[in-house]
Amino acid sequence: MIEIFAHRAIFNGIENSAKSIPYYKKLGIGIELDLRYNNNQVYISHDPTNNGDFFEEVCKQYDKSSIKLALHIKENEALNPTIKILEKYSIKNYFLFNTENFEYSNLVDKTKIADYVVKQDQNIKAKILWCDELQNKWYSEKIVKNLHKRKKLIYVMSLEVLEKCDEKSVYLEWERLINLGVDGICTKYPEKLIKFVKGDLN
């Protein structure tokens, strides 16, 4: 069964909100969150602002849940405090990625690091891959099979996360990604993707 991640834990039209956690715990799918650091606090926000919910509030509500957390570290300063919060609440089902290629500290379990992959010939070291085709279309059945032979987990960004598109284009993209055999999809429409995977979407 393909894994599903809610992009920025979107809930009732609001992104990166701690209020989404009970909903996605009940739904049983993963969430992707953007993490930043300011005033000695890790907070969730795509943009640099002090108005985001604290990441610790997310972890308090997580409470022994099994849903997977995809944590986008937006600033290097957020890294070590994030690890300490995860350890404080004994959260194990997560991975970290960043798009700036900064180095991870020794506090980070190397098995929890995902490589951010944007092209076919990129040097890949991690077991977990967080991928997109923003620059060009590079996914293929051959590439996915080869990565799986190397024991890689392939998580990809859905089309509507990367660009404006209509619903039909999103559904066609989901079909392509599923047929390619990727392990998970991050989407703005997690409920619809659940139905799509089950064949229940009219």
PLM region spans:
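Phosphate-group recognition and catalysis centered on beta-loop-alpha active-site segments
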Residues: 1-202
